[in-house]
């Protein structure tokens, strides 16, 4: 189960504890006209994170999906999120897009910032 905390107006931290790793992972949702999910989490965390996002917005309404760097806990569930949010674009830096994103995501729905 995820813990949701509003850390600023319409900015939410979604925290998920993975007991077998004894680690907590944080994901951030900006609730806006064009909602942003920052950090997708690992693929195995997708059901928990998407349920938490669903308590705040319709996950299909996500417009932007981004992360700080390319590792499984930051963007491992990217493809699941792109499937759940048909109008969402993945957003990352140019080098990340060239080196990782287009190969990993297998989609042209990528944007560099």
Model-flagged regions — what are they?
Residues 2-57:
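Conserved beta-strand hairpin/beta-sheet module of binuclear metal-dependent hydrolase folds
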């Amino acid at each position: 189960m995820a813990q949701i905390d509003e850390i600023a107006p319409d900015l939410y931290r979604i925290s998920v504890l993975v007991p077998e790793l004894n680690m907590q992972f944080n994901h951030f949702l900006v609730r806006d006209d064009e909602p942003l999910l920052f950090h997708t989490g690992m693929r195995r965390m997708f059901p928990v994170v998407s349920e938490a996002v669903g308590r705040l917005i319709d996950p299909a309404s996500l417009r932007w999906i981004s992360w700080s760097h390319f590792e499984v806990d930051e963007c491992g569930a990217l493809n699941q999120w792109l499937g759940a949010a048909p109008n969402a674009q993945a957003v990352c830096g140019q080098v990340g897009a060239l080196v990782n994103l287009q190969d990993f995501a297998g989609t042209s729905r990528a944007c560099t910032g």
